[in-house]
Each structure stands twice: as C-alpha cells, then as structure tokens.
Amino acid sequence: MAIHPTAIVEAGAQVDPSCDIGPYAVIGPLVRMGPGNSVGAHAVVTGRTTLGASNRIFPHAVIGGIPQDLKYRGEDTALVIGDRNTFREFATVNLGTAGGGGVTRIGSGGLFMASSHIGHDCQVGDGAIIANSVAIAGHVLIEDHVHFGGLSASHQFCRVGRLAFVGGMTGVAMDVAPYCTVAGARGELAGLNTIGMQRAGMTEEQVGRVKQAYKIVFRSSLGLAEAIAQLEAELAGHPETDHFIAFLKGSQRGITR
C-alpha cells in the first residue's frame, strides 16, 4: 500500500494493502476498501462506505458524504460500491437515509465524470455512464448500462430502465422505459437506443421484439394498461420484453411518453 505522508487514514478504516492513497486524501474511520483501489489527491472517502476492488477516485471527489436531505438526522446509513468504477474530479456520492432504505448502492464498471452527483438512496446498476455535471436526485433507480449526457438531471424517485439513454441537458421527471432515449429540457421521448442495444450484444431478433413493444406502447392510441395487456399477450416469454413489461407495470411516477 502506498499512502502519501500527507494523507489521513483515520483509525478504524480497513484499507487493503494494495490500495494507493494520494496527497492530502482523507479516508474516514468507517470506510472499507477492497484491493486495488486508488484515491487521488485531496479526495475524501467517508461515512460507512464500502468499496470493492479496483475503483479509481480522482482528486477532490467526495465519496460517502452525508445526504443533502433536510430530514437526515445523522442516522447510521451506508454507501456500497462495487468494482472497477471511476469517479472523476469533484464527483460526489452520498450515503443513504433511514427513510430511503439506508443504503446508496452503485454497481460495477461505471464512469462518473467530473462534477457529477449521485444523491442519497440511489440504486445504480452496472456499467453506468454519468457524464459531466449530471445531477441525480435522491431515491433514483438507474438500471444496468444507462447513459446520462452532460448537464442532465433526474427528479427524485424516478426510474431509468436498462440501456436507456438520456441526452445532454435533459430533465427527467418521469420514469424512462428500458431501451429508450429521452432528450430535451422536459425529457421527451426520442426513440429507441438501437446503437446501445447492438453494442450490448442483443441479437436482431431481440432488438426486433423491443421495437414491436415500443410501437405498441408509444406509437399506438392505447392507454398504458391496454398496451401492457397487449404486450403480455403478444411478446411475453422473452427476457428483453419481459423486463420491459415488468418495468412498465412497476411505475409509480408514470412513463415518459
């Protein structure tokens, strides 16, 4: 382990010997860090934060800070981060709150660009790409392989489905269905993330079924309940469309249409 002489690793922190801690970095007493993590100059990892392996935290990032929530009263909450994530300069990720389950979670293989923010109680899947200055409010669910363009934002409690793409400077105020693209100041539906599906290795048949589902929900005159019923009748039994159907049925805020 390489700990710079100016870094502070507080008593109680459990840091794997293979980690690198840069100049003036601060590691709090409740932090648990697995092998191969690196923490850059002036970065802070604090709170009850657990990191897996091979995460990179760049200078001035703050990982595990207390929630930006007026209801937070200092309760013991946590942040759990997987493996191989990158948190660029000034990125912030907050702990959970008692009112939101107590744990903020981030999967593996994500890129959180400079000045991006992940709020309290968010659940972020694998392979997220969160671009510069993106603001994700509390309690947001982001499924696997979601992309947020720069300067975009999500309202609290929204859900963004697998392989969705949120364009730059977009405000998300309702759920974004899996495989879909939204863009514009008010987060309007802009089609399917076909390139993302192809890059994820989905077959032509799978992409074709998603296109059928998209047309039923978003390009017909059916109400959402009627569209879901038609999806279940015509496209159930395939993982990609089963997930699409389950996501629609689980929406509390409504679907971006």
Swiss-Prot record:
The keyword Acyltransferase is annotated on this UniProt entry: yes
Keyword field: Acyltransferase, Cytoplasm, Lipid A biosynthesis, Lipid biosynthesis, Lipid metabolism, Repeat, Transferase
Protein name: Acyl-[acyl-carrier-protein]--UDP-N-acetylglucosamine O-acyltransferase
Keyword Transferase: yes
PANTHER family listed in its UniProt record: ACYL-[ACYL-CARRIER-PROTEIN]--UDP-N-ACETYLGLUCOSAMINE O-ACYLTRANSFERASE, ACYL-[ACYL-CARRIER-PROTEIN]--UDP-N-ACETYLGLUCOSAMINE O-ACYLTRANSFERASE, MITOCHONDRIAL-RELATED
Catalytic activity: a (3R)-hydroxyacyl-[ACP] + UDP-N-acetyl-alpha-D-glucosamine = a UDP-3-O-[(3R)-3-hydroxyacyl]-N-acetyl-alpha-D-glucosamine + holo-[ACP]
Job of this protein: Involved in the biosynthesis of lipid A, a phosphorylated glycolipid that anchors the lipopolysaccharide to the outer membrane of the cell.
Compartment(s) of residence: Cytoplasm
A Pfam family that the UniProt record links to this protein: Acetyltransf_11
Domain of life: Bacteria
